[in-house]
Swiss-Prot record:
Belongs to the class IV-like SAM-binding methyltransferase superfamily. RNA methyltransferase TrmH family. GO terms for molecular function: RNA binding; RNA methyltransferase activity. SMART domains: SpoU_sub_bind (SM00967). NCBIfam families: rRNA_methyl_3. This is Putative TrmH family tRNA/rRNA methyltransferase. Its EC number is 2.1.1.-. Disulfide bonds: none annotated. It comes from Staphylococcus aureus (strain MSSA476). GO terms for biological process: methylation; RNA processing.
Amino acid sequence: MEDTVIVGRHAVREAIITGHPINKILIQEGIKKQQINEILKNAKDQKIIVQTVPKSKLDFLANAPHQGVAALIAPYEYADFDQFLKQQKEKEGLSTVLILDGLEDPHNLGSILRTADATGVDGVIIPKRRSVTLTQTVAKASTGAIEHVPVIRVTNLAKTIDELKDNGFWVAGTEANNATDYRNLEADMSLAIVIGSEGQGMSRLVSDKCDFYIKIPMVGHVNSLNASVAASLMMYEVFRKRHDVGEI
């Protein structure tokens, strides 16, 4: 199976720390070693090959800002949905999952994973069709969070929502109209929050499966927010409702 290339110091460091299989780390010629001391130490401890290469090679492999560091890793694996449900049943406390319906921008997915990790979201669900996948761009945008937040890829979102409901989740869809202000969201139950695509919103089949709908009030001239911004507001609202000020 072909290696995946990840770039950037945060992404590479998290891949090493979490034990993601790494075949080789590439370091740009002339980079100051003190800037990457932690990466070099961890790589040595785990006996990972480190190779110094010209900047032009990193530029070619990365096709994006790389901070002088890249790694050739095994492709990212998706979490198993049935195993995920089992883990949620066994955990203490309430669960939160994000469902991304038609999100195609890898930067948005990376940003969402970063916030999901920060707020303790248990997993992110994406469909196999009409959706971004786990790529180098997602990994870099997530600044390493891709190593910590399970991403589940499913064939049928509507069926997946039914299974979540059967396992105690309430499903909240994000809508612009005929919806409750997200600040009034009740978070005292396990939640699955659906974020639709920026252009189309939720698909009809997915929307019909939601238990209730929430919206983000807006008073400006634009009529929608970036999907990652909307998702972040939702995740932090759930976090705020479940954790008292000063608790964390």
